[in-house]
């Protein structure tokens, strides 16, 4: 089957924004104009095509990035038909792992800002992620029809808060209720969209008299930005010659792809104005898969760097970037194909796990509908059905040419909550549901607490876990109760001791006898956690019983004597003991070792350890004092401060996890929502006496 759309006409783009900047409405309009949806879905009534999970429709926030395919050949049908793969990304801080994952597979992004709210904290986080993956981007200032809308203020905020280099290529005609269209600075004409057909057609008109001067000034800025693309253009510009429209677009494209400028447009998605011109800008200024550098990776056999060109002729390579459960077909694995071609029925290699996978059916998504396709070619995005063991971030490739594409880094979860099924019937379903959800979302973990037998779920924040519990209920019909957030404490010893225990029972018939002497000492914190050394001389304990001593101690480690938390960082030497020819058994030595360990721990000055988090807060300078004071109150140690590169400060600190619950809410209110933070586990360290006492009390409570 030959390629239908040349790879140069592909645009893989993300629509990214802060909550409530109107991103979903913008995506919805894109789908409408590109001919996919005939009735416009409004987020206001929960009908948007890309918000296809029920909770998103309810909460009005976009949680999962849906990949949608559509086509565009220009407002005036001036381009050959281009194929867009649009990835909708979430804007809430608990879902940054989703945003990061989408950024990895995009070639370009459209950043949507609210004309009233401007650059918001989440916009800064997303901007940093786009910088990390070097994604070329456009900015679209939405909601120009709202009270307080101001396009030029957002241009300034992009410079000061994001340290961006925005270059408007349109400016608004009017604002608030009077917003009627835009001035196209390339053509120096106003564009007025037809309200009757929801903006599908438009007319060019003269620039309103009161805007001519402003338009001239912004056109000059745009031409200067274009001229900086090459010496040749700069000479032409400085020599007083006019640059042609083609030269300007070509130069702006070159600088956008290099990340030197960010072209800016504006409109009101809700009022069907401006999105159409932005789609033309995507064609003109954002990259095709062939415009970006070859994807880098590592050959798993040689561990040497390798790469793949975006070409059908190359060997197949793709990245699995999203898992979704679909109630009709089961697991959907979204893949971005970087090179080569894959057909349904092909067998490919999962190079991360070293396993083979058969590609079942391949489908292309239009928000929540799907079309079966026979093959996917370089530069395209599709979903595969029937993959057995593929997790987000893994590479699929040709068996004859293995490669592991850059791994995505996922943060460690920081919050644990116990979940209990409400009924016996829910118990089995819950296990299946949680395992499926963990496969979809690498920042979410599930484990069983050995002491209580409870199921513990861990994630990136309280909202993250709320949504997981919600999805269990909706998608799998599991009703569950959830506990309060918990901290994972540990225990250890502070001094070396010697302990002895003799387990001897004689009650008629075969007795039990095991006798051990152990030396216990603290190990380097954060090391292996436990080490067992056999120092028995002269067979005082026979060889076959030595592993039982080790096992007896290992089985006791999960329940320490301070507050019943797992014991870490202890070294045990088995130095002496005795046995009985008839009465000694493996069980007797396990019991003796377990008791000797408990005895030793009591003498060894036991301590409670608490998890310490590395916390980074990015805040505007004026809130710096409040942020530092608050971290100190939380028993935090501030390690340093840096400029964050976008006009604010970055504070680095180490803070006990126990003090960080509810932090995002407190930080939001202390900084009017302008600071953001990230935290990850750093180390365990000894908890102060009063904290240890309180924890112990609560456990025994």
UniProtKB/Swiss-Prot annotation:
Q: What species is given as this protein's source?
A: Neisseria meningitidis serogroup B (strain ATCC BAA-335 / MC58)
Its ancestry begins with: Bacteria, Pseudomonadati, Pseudomonadota, Betaproteobacteria, Neisseriales
Q: InterPro entries per the record?
A: EFG_II, EFG_III, EFG_III/V, EFG_IV, EFG_V, EFG_V-like, EFTu-like_2, G_TR_CS
Q: Which GO biological process annotations does it have?
A: ribosome disassembly
Recorded hits in Gene3D superfamilies, A to Z, give:
3.30.230.10, 3.30.70.240, Elongation Factor G (Translational Gtpase), domain 3 (3.30.70.870), P-loop containing nucleotide triphosphate hydrolases (3.40.50.300), Translation factors (2.40.30.10)
Q: What is this protein called?
A: Elongation factor G
Write down the SMART domains for this protein, in alphabetical order.
Answer: EFG_C, EFG_IV
HAMAP family per record: EF_G_EF_2_B
**UniProt KW keywords:** Cytoplasm, Elongation factor, GTP-binding, Nucleotide-binding, Protein biosynthesis
**Location, primary (coarse class):** cytoplasm
Annotated TM spans: none
Q: Which cysteines are joined by disulfide bonds?
A: none
Q: Where does the tr-type G domain lie?
A: 8-290
Q: Does the keyword GTP-binding apply?
A: yes
């Amino acid at each position: 089957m030959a390629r239908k759309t040349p790879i140069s006409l592909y645009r893989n783009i993300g629509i990214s924004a802060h909550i409530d900047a109107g991103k979903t409405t913008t995506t919805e309009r894109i789908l409408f104009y590109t001919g996919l949806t005939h009735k416009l879905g409004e987020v206001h009534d929960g009908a948007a095509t890309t918000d296809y999970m029920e909770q998103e429709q309810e909460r009005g926030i976009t949680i999962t990035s849906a990949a949608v395919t559509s086509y565009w050949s220009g407002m005036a049908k001036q381009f050959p038909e281009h194929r867009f793969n649009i990835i909708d990304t979430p804007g809430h801080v608990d879902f940054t792992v989703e945003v990061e994952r989408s950024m990895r597979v995009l070639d370009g992004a459209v950043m949507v800002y609210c004309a009233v709210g401007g650059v918001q904290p989440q916009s800064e986080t997303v901007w940093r992620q786009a910088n990390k993956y070097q994604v070329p981007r456009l900015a679209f200032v939405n909601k120009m029809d709202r009270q307080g809308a101001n396009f030029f203020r957002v241009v300034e905020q992009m410079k000061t808060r994001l340290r961006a280099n925005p270059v408007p290529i349109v400016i608004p005609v009017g604002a608030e209720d009077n917003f009627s269209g835009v001035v196209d600075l390339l053509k120096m004409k106003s564009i007025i969209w037809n309200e009757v057909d929801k903006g599908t057609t438009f007319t060019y008109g003269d620039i309103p008299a009161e805007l001519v001067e402003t338009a001239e000034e912004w056109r000059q800025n745009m031409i200067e930005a274009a001229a900086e693309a090459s010496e040749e253009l700069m000479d032409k510009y400085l020599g007083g010659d006019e640059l042609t429209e083609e030269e300007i677009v070509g130069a702006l494209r070159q600088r956008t792809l290099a990340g030197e400028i960010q072209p800016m447009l504006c409109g009101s998605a809700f009022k069907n104005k401006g999105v159409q011109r932005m789609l033309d800008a995507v064609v003109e200024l954002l990259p095709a898969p062939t415009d970006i550098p070859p994807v880098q990776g590592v050959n798993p056999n040689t561990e040497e760097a390798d790469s793949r060109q975006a070409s059908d002729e190359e060997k197949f390579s793709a990245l699995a970037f999203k898992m979704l459960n679909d109630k009709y077909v089961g697991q959907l694995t979204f893949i971005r194909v970087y090179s080569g071609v894959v057909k349904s029925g092909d067998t490919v290699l999962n190079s991360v796990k070293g396993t083979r996978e058969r590609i079942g059916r391949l489908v292309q998504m239009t928000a929540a509908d799907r079309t079966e396709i026979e093959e996917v070619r370089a530069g395209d995005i599709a979903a595969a059905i029937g993959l057995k063991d593929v997790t987000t971030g893994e590479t699929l490739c040709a068996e004859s040419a293995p490669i592991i594409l850059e791994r995505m880094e996922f943060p460690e979860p920081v919050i644990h909550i116990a979940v209990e099924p409400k009924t016996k019937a829910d118990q089995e379903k819950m296990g299946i549901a949680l395992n499926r959800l963990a496969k979809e979302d690498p920042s979410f973990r599930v484990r069983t607490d050995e002491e209580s037998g409870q199921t513990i779920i861990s994630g990136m924040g309280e909202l993250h876990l709320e949504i997981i519990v919600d999805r269990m209920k909706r998608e799998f019909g599991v009703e569950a109760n959830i506990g309060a957030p918990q901290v994972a404490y540990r225990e250890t010893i502070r001094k070396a001791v010697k302990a002895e225990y003799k387990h001897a029972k004689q009650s008629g018939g075969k007795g039990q006898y095991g006798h051990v002497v152990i030396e216990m000492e603290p190990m380097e914190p954060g090391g292996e956690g436990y080490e067992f050394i056999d120092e028995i001389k002269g067979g005082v304990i026979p060889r076959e019983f030595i592993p039982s001593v080790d096992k007896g101690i290992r089985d006791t480690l999960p329940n320490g004597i301070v507050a019943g938390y797992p014991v870490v960082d202890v070294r045990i030497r088995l130095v002496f003991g005795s046995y009985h020819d008839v009465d000694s058994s493996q069980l007797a030595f396990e019991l003796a070792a377990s008791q000797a360990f408990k005895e030793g721990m009591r003498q060894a000055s036991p301590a409670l350890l608490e998890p310490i988090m590395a916390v980074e807060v990015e805040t505007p300078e004026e809130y710096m004092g409040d942020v530092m004071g608050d971290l100190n109150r939380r028993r935090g140690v501030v390690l340093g401060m840096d400029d964050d590169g976008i006009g604010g400060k970055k504070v680095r600190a180490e803070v006990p996890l126990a003090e960080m619950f509810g932090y995002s809410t407190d930080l939001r209110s202390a900084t009017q929502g302008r600071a953001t933070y990230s935290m990850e586990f750093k180390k365990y360290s000894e908890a102060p006496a009063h904290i240890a006492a309180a924890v112990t009390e609560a456990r025994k409570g």
